Every structure is written in C-alpha cells, then in structure tokens.
Amino acid sequence: MTKFLTKLTKLEQEINHPAVKRQVEEIALIDSYVQAGKPLKRAPRRLGLLPDEFEEVLVEVGPDKEGALRDLNNLLNNFRQYLSLIYGIWSLPNIQTAQLIKNKLHVQTALEIMAGNAYWSQALAQVGIKVHSTDSLEWAKTSTTGAKPFYPVEDLPADQAIKKYHTVNLVLCSWSPNFGHGDLETVAAWHKYNPSCHLLFVGEKDGATNSPEFWHQNWFKNSAALDEINHSLQSFDFINEKVVEIKNEF
C-alpha cells in the first residue's frame, strides 16, 4: 500500500484518458489534505469506474489497455483501505459537512467517542465547535497509524466519556465496528447521561459499520437538517456512508 500512489500514477499515464486522470488527481488532492492533517473542503467526488463507464473508457483507449484499466480501477475502489492502512482513518470528513452540523443542529460543543485518529474532531473544531475527542486507544497500541492523531485524543472509553462530558450539544461516533455491541452501549450511556443532546453516527447501514442489532432498532430520526447534512457527505466509493441520528425519545 505504500506504493499505492506511485502505481496509480503510472497506470494513469499508461492509460492516458481524461476520466481516469480526473480521478487520480482527486486522490492526489485528498492524500495531500490528509497528509497535512487538514479536513477536505468538500466531500470527494465519486471514485472508481462503474461497469458502463469502464466499457466506455476501454472503447476509447483500446483493448490492449484492458489489464491496466482493471488494475487502476481496483486501486480506485480500494482507496478507503489505503487511507485506513496509511493514516488510520476510514471516513473522510469535510468542512462543508462540519459547518452544516454546527449550523443546522445548533452545536457549540461536541464529544467524539471511539475517535481513533480524530479526523472528525479536527473538522468540527475548524468550524468553531469546542470538541472533546476520546478513545480507549486499545487499537493504537498495536498499530503505527495510531501514533499521529489529527486532534488531541483523551484515553477514555465511550461510556465514561459520555458521563464526563455530559453537557455537550453533540455526541459523534464515526465508523463504530460492525462487531460487538459498542454502539448499543453508547446509546445506553447517552440515554442515561445526556439524552437531550444530538447523537450522531457516521457509517453504513447493514454494512461496513455498527452491529446488526443497532440497525434493526426503531430509533432513527428523520429531518430536513439531516437530509441536508447527508447531501454534503455523498460517499466516494461503493460504501454507502451516511450520518444517522438517534431519536431523543424511543
């Protein structure tokens, strides 16, 4: 994965097609922001070629480049994995979404739990929200990607963090694991210590994040504000990443 960008650039030059070039440039831009520890200004454009797009490009570049095009498309579709392995992040927050969370939900103070490298905390802080970022940091003890968080992270399990920072306007959890019951325990702690604040999860329904039990509950809130927030966070790959909010009463 360390040679990911080099391989991508080499294949793009070999294929020499504007649609491919645009996507490789988008990845280079994203990587430069992440490497600098800065949130993106907006959500990334969609990456990867859909089957019909793949065929259109292949017709234009010729059948002799089919192998290179398939290799490149595989790399495009695995960009999120590259981000996780190199930077320890699964989600790409952006300033536009962070600003909407602040404005539409009237957030002045926030707590990010299970924050990992706290990229979302960095984005929220940049739009003027006072943020407390917490994580048990167990994963960071065995991973080099945990050495350089984007924002200061306090060593604190989720339930204890929610209890300690019970006056915040927002509790945020991005990419809760799709195993165990950490998400259910989070909802229980929030319901006990700070049920009047907003509780947001960033993830994929019935997919890459959160437990099956979490998604099968009748506790999700719908609102025009949430629709607008999600419109600014359109997923860049095959993972249908969205922001979901838990009802204050359920």
Model-derived segments and their meaning:
Residues 1-92, 237-239:
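N-terminal accessory regions of S-adenosyl-L-methionine
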Residues 84-108:
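Conserved alpha-helix/loop element of class I SAM-dependent methyltransferases that forms part
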Residues 106-116:
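Conserved class I S-adenosyl-L-methionine
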Residues 114-120, 179-180:
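Gly/Ser/Thr-rich loops at beta-strand to alpha-helix junctions
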Residues 117-129:
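Conserved SAM-binding loop of SAM-dependent methyltransferases across substrates and taxa
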Residues 134-170:
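S-adenosyl-L-methionine
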Residues 168-182:
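A short SAM/SAH-binding and catalytic strip from SAM-dependent methyltransferases
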Residues 181-250:
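C-terminal substrate-binding/active-site "lid" region of AdoMet-derived donor-dependent transferases
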